């Protein structure tokens, strides 16, 4: 795979210089990915993707599955499919969009990159790793000439305010920086807009009370006249993007 190296300075969680890489997911990454996901979703009972599910997703759309590594260890990922958004519109659930994890909803001729997963191991948060995953997803959207990125976003702090605020009021307060929501605040800072509040998107997500934000990022380079056939002929590999992170410590 082609390699690009860009040297960055930011926080590191150890004394050594850290090498951060973004690349496509392979099945060889499964055990490390499972461990990171269980840590990331400890508050949801340590949920994780089954190996056969990830295998099916990679077979459907290998270019849309991205991992980030810290000194060679897989510590996060961003998973996506392509959909024809008009078929789903603004009212759908997570199971609707994933075809109950069959991913039969993936449409290579679709116009929208739909983000179905993104997480970073909690021990590696604060290193801007999630931002790099999002940037890689945006780059993929641009290279594939897709109209936009759509995702259903959790609002994990909403449960703390649910007795006093409606989901809309909560989102407005997060947008106005009166409340810090670790997921929504980050997404808004990465140029995503809240298009709608979706109820019962993930009913088992008690922290969000089953709600999700329908998030959208528009590809300003989208060309509606570009041939889908030409898009299919393009080589759209994330490749290997590497950063060297020098440690930064606060007393």
Predicted region positions:
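Cationic, low-complexity basic patches in intrinsically disordered or flexible, solvent-exposed regions
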Residues: 4
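Short amphipathic alpha-helix that is part of the acyltransferase structural core
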Residues: 13-89
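C-terminal/domain-terminus segments
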Residues: 16, 21-26, 50, 133-140, ...
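Hydrophobic adenine-recognition pocket in adenosine-nucleotide-binding enzymes
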Residues: 25, 118-120
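Conserved acyl-donor/pantetheine-binding loop and adjacent beta-alpha core of acyl/acetyltransferases
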Residues: 78-117, 132-135, 154-182, 188, ...
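Conserved acetyl-CoA-binding loop-helix of GNAT-fold acetyltransferases
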Residues: 120, 126-142, 148-151
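Hydrophobic structural segments
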Residues: 229-251
